[in-house]
């Protein structure tokens, strides 16, 4: 997978070098390019924002900066072609198309010459809620681009125009407002990259995660068996795999009912699941 991130704070994406994502980079499973939006400015102050039309507080990020930036990242041209990746691979440039010469990027179909448009993800509190299903779907993408907004956001025309070169999704990681999109990018990038085969040492690790079956994951324990007067449940030492699986399912159901009962409406429940839930007193 190729990830490109456009931001005015490239250093904010430093965590992408570390832990499992860093390992994926080392193994060649993932390559990452972090692009400074100011590379596409034309004034001495490297301005990326202006006052909002119609008045109001804050500043809006300028289309004449964002447009060329996204054009170049999609095509692997301009400043995007010279950025230093977080690793040495340049595999993402093999199937990218040259820029047009008139300053306007050429619209492409969903596929052009057998090449699928990159996926552009725009973090915004006005977007669709980010879910595990999205992470699963995105984990199969070849090229994902994140556009990190700041201030009052990016001029909406940038998003509309980007459909000519990208498949675009506006996504929110929660019902709250952050200073910029960088934190959301770190969240979403980790959520999807960990699902790529070979990134996790044990593939079963994510198959048993919270939300994989629509439920919250139950509690986890390790040794010692007793700690500060608290015991690991006996069933986990029983050696009876069927009973352990049943206990884990019931713990997952109980936690979901207590913390996120809304999730139960979209989960396929067995008769045994329903009977267990009906008997719970929370």
Curated annotation (Swiss-Prot):
Which residues are recorded as binding S-adenosyl-L-methionine? 149, 173-178
Q: Which UniProt keywords apply?
A: Cytoplasm, Methyltransferase, S-adenosyl-L-methionine, Transferase, tRNA processing
Positions of the region Disordered?
Answer: 77-114
**Localization of this protein:** Cytoplasm
- Give the main localization category: cytoplasm
A GO biological process of this protein is: tRNA N1-guanine methylation
**GO CC list:** cytosol
Q: What is its EC number?
A: 2.1.1.228
Q: Which GO terms describe its molecular function?
A: tRNA (guanine(37)-N1)-methyltransferase activity
Q: This protein's superkingdom? A: Bacteria
Reaction(s) the record says it catalyses: guanosine(37) in tRNA + S-adenosyl-L-methionine = N(1)-methylguanosine(37) in tRNA + S-adenosyl-L-homocysteine + H(+)
Summarize subunit and interaction data from the UniProt record for this chain: Homodimer.
Function summary: Specifically methylates guanosine-37 in various tRNAs.
The record's comment on protein family reads: Belongs to the RNA methyltransferase TrmD family.
| Name of the featured protein | tRNA (guanine-N(1)-)-methyltransferase
| Organism field | Corynebacterium jeikeium (strain K411)
Gene (name only): trmD
């Amino acid at each position: 997978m190729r990830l490109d991130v456009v931001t005015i704070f490239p250093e904010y994406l430093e965590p992408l070098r570390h832990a499992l994502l860093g390992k994926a980079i080392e193994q060649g499973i993932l390559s990452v390019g972090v692009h400074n939006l100011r590379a596409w400015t034309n004034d001495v102050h490297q301005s990326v924002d202006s006052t909002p039309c119609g008045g109001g507080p804050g500043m809006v990020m300028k289309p004449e900066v964002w447009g060329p930036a996204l054009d170049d990242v999609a095509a692997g041209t301009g400043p995007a072609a010279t950025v230093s990746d977080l690793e040495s691979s340049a595999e993402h440039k093999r199937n990218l198309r040259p820029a047009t010469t008139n300053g306007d990027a050429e619209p492409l179909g969903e596929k052009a010459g057998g090449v699928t448009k990159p996926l552009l993800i725009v973090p915004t509190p006005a977007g669709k809620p980010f879910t595990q299903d999205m992470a699963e779907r995105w984990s199969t993408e070849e090229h994902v681009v994140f556009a990190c907004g700041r201030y009052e956001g990016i001029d909406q025309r940038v998003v509309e125009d980007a459909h000519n070169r990208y498949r675009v999704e506006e996504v929110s990681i929660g019902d709250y407002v952050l200073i910029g999109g960088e934190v959301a990018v770190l969240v979403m990038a980790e959520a999807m990259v960990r699902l790529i085969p070979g990134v996790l040492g044990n593939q079963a690790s994510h198959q048993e995660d919270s939300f994989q079956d629509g439920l919250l994951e139950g509690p986890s324990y390790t040794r010692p068996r007793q700690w500060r007067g608290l015991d690991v449940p006996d069933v986990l030492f029983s050696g009876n795999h069927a009973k352990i699986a049943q206990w884990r399912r019931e713990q997952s159901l109980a936690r979901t009912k207590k913390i996120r009962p809304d999730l139960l409406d979209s989960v396929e429940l067995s008769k045994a699941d329903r009977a267990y839930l009906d008997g719970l007193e929370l």
